[in-house]
């Protein structure tokens, strides 16, 4: 039996999956998919996912579930980031996904988001003995990760998580502009 794993990222902008098979003791990606869902859209205005957003996200997860079955995935990890941390009805979305697909979604902390970003980035940094800073600019938040020395253990970094991503910053600036305009009119 092959070891086949899936990683699913339910982000503020995209929902992504990577399915990997272990071939000759090395990971080989056998499937990748990404769908723009803009989960964070309108969160700045009402702080919840609309019914249509929940329906569309669940539809994407149905496709992911089907693909995981086709590829005989043995194990998976599904994480959700900023949008699900912020929305007041994220549990409704997560339960709907599970009910319709059997996929369990885990909302991760900003620390865990930064840690995962760091370790997925380290393979691309040639000399991380020097000081490095990594920016992870998402749809709902931005993580700044600081590393000073060669990272040997999972806690050897500092990070800052800002609630400003591509979508959230745009919407927050719209809120500010509308209130400023209304103030000027008065």
Place the predicted regions along the sequence by residue.
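Gly/Thr-rich phosphate-binding beta-strand-loop-beta motif of the actin/hexokinase/Hsp70
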Residues: 1-30, 121, 127-158
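Short, glycine-rich nucleotide/cofactor-binding loops
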Residues: 9, 53-54
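Short glycine-rich, Thr/Ser-proximal phosphate-binding strand/loop in the N-terminal lobe
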Residues: 14-51, 150-183
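A short glycine/small-residue-enriched secondary-structure motif
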Residues: 33-40, 70-75, 93-99, 112
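Glycine-/proline-rich flexible loop or hinge segments
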Residues: 40-50, 73-81, 104
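Short, well-ordered amphipathic alpha-helical segments that serve as non-catalytic structural scaffolds
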Residues: 55-67, 184-186
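Short beta-strand-loop/turn "lid" adjacent to the catalytic site in phosphate-handling enzymes
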Residues: 65-95
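Active-site neighborhood for divalent-cation/phosphate handling
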Residues: 77, 86-87, 94-142, 147
């Amino acid at each position: 039996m092959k070891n086949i794993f899936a990683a699913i990222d339910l982000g503020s902008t995209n929902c992504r999956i990577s399915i990997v098979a272990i071939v000759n003791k090395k990971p080989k990606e056998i499937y990748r998919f990404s769908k723009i869902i803009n989960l964070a859209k309108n969160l700045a205005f009402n702080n919840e996912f609309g019914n249509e957003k929940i329906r569309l996200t669940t539809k994407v997860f149905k496709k992911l579930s089907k693909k995981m079955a086709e590829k005989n995935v043995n194990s998976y990890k599904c994480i959700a980031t900023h949008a699900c941390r912020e929305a007041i009805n994220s549990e409704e979305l997560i339960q709907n996904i599970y009910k319709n697909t059997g996929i369990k979604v885990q909302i991760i902390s900003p620390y865990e988001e930064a840690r995962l970003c760091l370790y997925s980035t380290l393979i691309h940094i040639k000399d991380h003995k020097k000081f490095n800073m990594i920016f992870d600019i998402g749809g709902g938040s931005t993580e700044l990760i600081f590393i000073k020395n060669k990272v040997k253990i999972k806690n050897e970094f500092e990070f800052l998580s800002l609630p400003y991503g591509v979508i959230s910053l745009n919407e927050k600036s719209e809120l500010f502009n509308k209130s400023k305009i209304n103030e000027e009119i008065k």
